[in-house]
From Swiss-Prot:
A Pfam family reported for this protein in Swiss-Prot or TrEMBL: SDH_alpha
Name assigned to this protein: UPF0597 protein APJL_1638
InterPro entries in UniProt: Ser_deHydtase-like_asu (IPR005130), UPF0597 (IPR021144)
Record GO terms (molecular function): L-cysteine desulfhydrase activity
Transmembrane domains' residue ranges: none
Protein's organism: Actinobacillus pleuropneumoniae serotype 3 (strain JL03)
Protein family membership: Belongs to the UPF0597 family.
Record-level GO BP terms: L-cysteine catabolic process to pyruvate
Amino acid sequence: MKFKSELEQAIIATVQQEVVPALGCTEPVSLALAAAVARQYLGALPDRIEAKVSPNLMKNGMGVTVPGTGTVGLTMAAAIGAIGGDPNGGLEVLKHITNEQVAQAKQMIHDHKIEVSISDTEHILYSEATLFNADQQVKVRIAAHHTNVIYIEKNGELLFSKPCVVESENAENVFANLNAKDIYDFSLNVELEKIRFIQQAAILNSALSQEGLNQDYGLHIGRTLQKQIGKGLISDDLLNRIVIETTAASDARMGGANLPAMSNSGSGNQGITATMPVVVVARHLVASEEQLIRALFLSHLMAIYIHSKLPKLSALCAVTTAAMGSCAGVAWLLTGKFEAISMAISSMIGDISGIICDGAANSCAMKVSTSVSSSYKSILMALDDTQVTGNEGIVEHQIDRSINNLCAIASRSMQYTDRQVIEIMVSKPKSL
């Protein structure tokens, strides 16, 4: 396929929009940003905060550590966003918070000054923060995307508003007339200088991986597996290096490390999963700089392409689809053939389809480990000319039909699953 200039620009712009630095899990960060913007308009520290979030944002904010605070949950996200957040920081809203501000936020929580509840909203991704100080109050709403401020109100006066198209109705999809082979062809033929920016993903996520190997964050799965090599319980081979280095980055991210991840489709874990396997394999192969750049771009673009067929948040764990992106990048590094990519992604769909998202938490690193393991296993099968065939399950003989089948299940059939997961999570008894 020959890509017109306008389409080329649109594809690159989409990657630049979806692959951005993010400090901390992006759902609580979205609420922190709403609170930070509200504080900017309030002009003073709040006496109390009322926050409302969509069910999916509640699910993804309940069990994850807010970076730089050592504290789990949306109450901390709202408090620290209002006290120390940078309203212009986007997904790095909490980059410059101080220990003193964290202490202030914890005191507000201790004094029961923060209330977070579920909003009855049409938006899958929605956060609202209302800050109060004496007789002043400011309300800010974010919807559809993690940094998309759609509403600002102060003391009942509307200061800013813009329409927000429901995610599923968004017609402006750059991938509408593209398929997986087009994604592959574009990544290999686009001018190198136009996609060099993707190298930053390797830099940021490699630093996060090293942080996860240096300290115990979250479930410290990567660090645990690294220790087992020294004990002779697992081997120091390419598969385990992929798993260890990718999972360590997720450990650090979910465990509250004060380092940004390069995200993909609004998720740090998806960005990590789309990046680190490619970095590890490129290093193993002593790949050239151009090979690394193109493999990274192919990985991230394929991940975005697949995720574009999904709701922004759903019951399907999206690191599985991000791993299909890195599957493409790694398979290209090892074979240079689209056929291997097609075979491997088909096998992944036959393997890990249906892994549920039960909220952002330290256990996300387990799903990262599972997904990248499936990816490499599927690539090895393709190298041996083997794959899950179109005669089995939801896999079809054509890769895009298989991808569409997976995403249809996530978008439709798994919506009840999502509601059930959220119901279970919000009704669990609090730990003592």
